[in-house]
Structure formats: structure tokens, C-alpha cells
Amino acid sequence: MKITLLAVGTKMPRWVDEAYADYAKRLPREVQLELKEIKPEKRGGGVTAEKGIAAEHARLMAALPPRAKLVVLDERGRNWTTMQLADNLKGWLADGQDIAIVIGGADGTAAELKSRADILLQLSAMTLPHGMVRVLLAEQVYRAVSILNGHPYHRE
């Protein structure tokens, strides 16, 4: 199974890249976590939030892996526990289905992308920095896989 994390934004602080890479490399061979950075649209100079979202949407659509289950992060999405993530991951692994998880830009994601999503997922009711979201997702994927493999990383 391949999980592709499509994140609008580039040039993250080194600690973000290092923490993300650490969790990604801990995963077993049957679960690959790949990061695809999507160039954000510059704002200002007549580029409205709507135009920026549209440009980022086009880039995201071009980068989406074909036939992958689409999970889009959204503040109005479902709020899963780690165990719910593990349960869903178990089903996706059994189906052999690849996953694409989208972290939108500063102004969010296009309504079209949200309507196309198989799952809208909320990580927190709080606003989180994009770099932190990358690390949090990588850690939660690792934790969910650890649960499925009976590894003692997660404690109930």
C-alpha cells in the first residue's frame, strides 16, 4: 500500500522534514508513505484567495495518484480517534487500496476537491501550522500501523 501525502507548501523548517522522514522510514515495507509538495500560489498583486485556491486545486489534481482513495483534511471533516484510523487503514490494506491525503493551502481547498473526497477528515478543532500537520499525519500513520502489527508503540 502506498500513502501519498499531498501538501500545499514547500520549504518547511528542517525539523519538519527530519521528523516526517523519521516516521516515514519506521513504517514496514508494505506501507510506503510518500510526500509530494505542491507549490503554493503566491497571494497579492491581484491574486485573490479564490484564484489561489483554484491554481492550487489544478496542481493537486495533476498530482493525485490514479484510483487512490482520497482523504482531504478539512476543519468540518470527521474527527477520528487513532483506533478509528487504524481500523480504516486495516480495511484499506486488505483491499490493497492506495491512499492520497491532501493538506490544503493557507486558504483551504477547493469545494470541488472536497466534494470528490471519499473522506473529509479533521485533525483538530484548532488551527495547526502546515509543517506540524505533516509530522502529525506521519506519526499517526506510523501509530496506526503499529497498532495493526501489535507493536507496543501505542498504549490504550
UniProtKB/Swiss-Prot annotation:
Catalysis: reaction(s): pseudouridine(1915) in 23S rRNA + S-adenosyl-L-methionine = N(3)-methylpseudouridine(1915) in 23S rRNA + S-adenosyl-L-homocysteine + H(+)
Top-level taxon of the source organism: Bacteria
SUPFAM superfamilies: alpha/beta knot
Keywords, in A-Z order: Cytoplasm, Methyltransferase, rRNA processing, S-adenosyl-L-methionine, Transferase
EC number(s) on file: 2.1.1.177
GO terms assigned for molecular function: rRNA (pseudouridine-N3-)-methyltransferase activity
One Gene Ontology CC term in the entry: cytoplasm
Subcellular location(s) per record: Cytoplasm
Binding of S-adenosyl-L-methionine, residues: L73, G104, L123, S124, A125, M126, T127, L128
A matching Pfam family: SPOUT_MTase
Function: Specifically methylates the pseudouridine at position 1915 (m3Psi1915) in 23S rRNA.
Record-linked PANTHER family: METHYLTRANSFERASE, RIBOSOMAL RNA LARGE SUBUNIT METHYLTRANSFERASE H
Subunit structure: Homodimer.
NCBIfam families named among the record's database cross-references: PRK00103.1-4 (NF000986)
Family: Belongs to the RNA methyltransferase RlmH family.
Protein name: Ribosomal RNA large subunit methyltransferase H
